[in-house]
Amino acid sequence: MDISFYTGAGGGVWSLEECARWAKAHDFDAIRLSAGGVADPETVLREGPDEINDTLKAHGLYLAGLAAHNNLLDDDPEKRDAAASRLHKAIEAASRLGTPAVITHAGSPVGFRFYGGYSAPPGNPSDRSTELVGRFKERFTPIVKLAEEKGVKIALDVAVRMGNIACNPQMWERVLDAVPSDSLGLSCDPSHWLWMMILPPEDAIRAFAGKWYYADVKDCEVSREMLFRQGIIGNWWWQYRVPGRGQLNWGTIIGALLESGYDYVLCVENEDHGLPGLAGIDLGGRHLRQFLPKKGEPYDRPPGFWKVE
């Protein structure tokens, strides 16, 4: 496994050259770019991949993936068509860039309330999960076919609060079954599972062995005192942290990923209010590195996946 981080470059943030120079100086192997700025898909398709690839290669880095979050499940047909067009271009741009992964999300028109009212049984009048899985199949089938043709894998983000039906094991099964393809999988980010109580995270990883196509890694901290004071409807009883500043066991998580067949990047994502910016990304990368085999040393993976049945 390599270590990467998520950032934008160009378009008002730091330049790709500045980004690459910092990444190399802080022992990163790769970066993941958002589909904007220097990595805007229309720019890449019009001008080609050389500016990005040559700049990264000059610093001994590579592009780990392209982030293109677009809500293809919006209730407004025009908005979901526009989102599909943007994702289509991002997949074509990723193929031109030679990066194997596009990270997106399944989307949702109702935020995280797609199951309907709390404590209401499945199929209640406000439960839209079945409808939205059907919409996912309709909207993502041509997108996944394009990814197959272009040799790109789509990794679905597992975050929930952005509005995303693919946010828990039940819905991962449903969307992956709806569009079965080796080009559609998941992006591992166990920070969400801690506060959602999808625990232990290593069992969630092993249950979907072979379907982790990317690993967006954050940590999380739950305050039991604030949970007592606010209950789950509060807004401050959990916080995202960079790896090493939260409550997740990264040695165990990385072991589960390796045992589940994942051998690509660990991509640091910084939403840590207590250590924002590059300082947090640097700490996260250093914390993760200690759990990996030394560079150049192969990992002797056991035969077959260790999968929860």
Tell what function each PLM region has.
Residues 6-10, 34-36, 68-71, 107-109, ...:
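Active-site beta-loop-alpha junctions enriched in small/polar residues
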Residues 32-53, 109-113:
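Glycine-rich, proline-tolerant flexible connector loops at the mouths of alpha/beta enzymes
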Residues 16-36, 97-101:
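Catalytic domains of carbohydrate-active enzymes, especially glycoside hydrolases
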Residues 12-23, 81-91, 196-205, 250-253:
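Short, acidic/polar
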